UniProtKB/Swiss-Prot annotation:
SUPFAM superfamilies associated with the record: Winged helix' DNA-binding domain
Functional summary from the UniProt entry: DNA-dependent RNA polymerase catalyzes the transcription of DNA into RNA using the four ribonucleoside triphosphates as substrates. Specific core component of RNA polymerase III which synthesizes small RNAs, such as 5S rRNA and tRNAs.
Gene: RPC82
Name of protein: DNA-directed RNA polymerase III subunit RPC3
Region called Leucine-zipper, residue ranges: 563-584
Taxonomic classification: Eukaryota, Fungi, Dikarya, Ascomycota, Saccharomycotina
Species annotation: Eremothecium gossypii (strain ATCC 10895 / CBS 109.51 / FGSC 9923 / NRRL Y-1056) (Yeast)
UniProtKB keywords: DNA-directed RNA polymerase, Nucleus, Transcription, Zinc
Amino acid sequence: MNGSMGAAGGQVENERAAEVPVSTLEMRTLSPETFLYTEVARSHLGERAGRVIELLLNKGRLSVSELVHLAPELGSKSVRTVLVSLIQLRCVQYLEETTVSGRKITYYYFNEDGFQLMLYAGDIVAAVESQFEADDAKEIAAQIVQNVLALGSLTTKDYMQSLASDVSVNDVASMFVKLVELGFLVPLSNVHYMPLADLWDVLYKKEYNAIPKNSTLSDAKKRAETKAKTKVQFNTLLKNVEMSNVLMTDMQTSMRRVQDNLPLTFNFGRYMKHRRSRQLVQFARSRVGSVPAMIYKVALKITEQCARALSDPLCETGLMQELEEQLAIQEDMALDDEKLPGVTFNAVDISRNLPNNIDLRGTLTSMQRRSQERSTHQGQSHKRLKAEDGMAVAVNHLATVEEEAEGDELLHGSDDDMDMFFDEGDSDPKSVSLINGHLKLLSTGSVPFLIESRPGLFYVPYSKLMPILKEAVYDAIIASTLGPSAHRILRCVRDNSLVSEKVINNTALMREKDIRSVIATLVKYNAVDILEVPRTADRAASRAVFLFKINEKHAYDFMKQNLAWNIANSIHKTEILKEENFTLLSKAQRDDVKGREAELLLPSELNQLKMVNERELNGHARKIRLLSMWEVFKML
């Protein structure tokens, strides 16, 4: 897939000549995201594109003359050529402004959408393929999406003209319609090439200047009225295009098809909904089990297209700096979780969309039967164990971890809810009562995977789930990298909000020396913040008390930057590996060598080629794992 994305920069020269130096250590450590996107640009589009992206990231918006001034080795013609390809791939946005003298200047901005499409390119194709069952449909959909990703956008007319003679035109046209209806392909518009913050400013100035100069309104009321009107226009421009303007009916075949000359591009927001569903399914599997997670996966699949976006576009306009606007946006997003059309479902909807090979019989047990088994087990057990202090303890008094977990989980549900948990005598493998039982499990646990808005009607509360998911992923990373002790102290600080070292000593049940060492490590990685509280009026440092707290924003931002650096470093090492073995790789890719490597290559060359391929695959697998964690803190 990287090869097809590399071909995307049609006019970008992918040359190895070292006109522009490779990423320096200073740049890599100064800004991890700059390091990441620069490496992605270099690996896919070449050194010149990487240099332009690096300048746009470091300096902000720039004109062509400013880019040439900062990178004289590129030249004006080369800069313009690179910008055309970057704009085509949605890696750069632009805005034309008029100066006081009347001169028009075009400024170019960095746009991360294009680079995220490159990072997820392989998984995007797999995600689209998963929407279809037939192999022919999967192949056609994959080819369409690959071409859209490689070119940035395309029209159905241009794609049809490039088809081979043995490909059915009607099947391809029908697939375009399906991809548009699923939301993966959307019409390309000027909004894709314009920064949202600048779009907001343009609309705001237009509305504000439209207010009569002799208006008696106060400035505060003028701004409030302007803001309200701007929001309406802003949301109108960004809302989904009406299908009537995209799809048409072919008069000859009476089939629906996409308009021939309408350029289509990939909808990254729709794909991220799919990634969000995948994250939540994995989270549910770890908390409530594989069978409820399977039910949850079906529920997410039938509602994810209608579900709200990962973030509100208004968040990118600067309105989040105002507390009232921030709270209003959060309330609107929470309301959209329940009120948007198509986001609610019931057990019948799940039953209708379950795979045919699913059998839910035996996956739930009635509470009455479980209590009988437990009482029988307790009645039969009369053995006694001797504890360390010499006390004899009955075996049935030592509850297992599973029993304690079951008890804690059941505390969150009412008796009426528990009555649904039975399957004795139910012969239907997709029984609605069984599905309802699993939905109750998902909605009554400590983590609200679902919320029952009305009896039998459920929805997914993304606004409540995302913070819990972030916390769970963050804790898992801390526990796996810094150890269980760090995770224990982190939870201790979080549970007590603001805590002293003495409280940690009493609750963490660890040695004081170990606690101080672990706290120092957590502070180093921004997992815990230190707050100095003076105890005297003169604020003497010797009498101050140091308390510890968790600032989730700082902790998550640091983790996001850390993961971004690791992704970039993985790509950087892979590119260095390819450069060091450039001669061997070029030789192995020759047409007369392909398929005959064992005959034409030396044994040492074969071993080296095997090593390069293995390291490249390992780097790619590492990058995919890091991306799955990075997206939790970056986009979800």
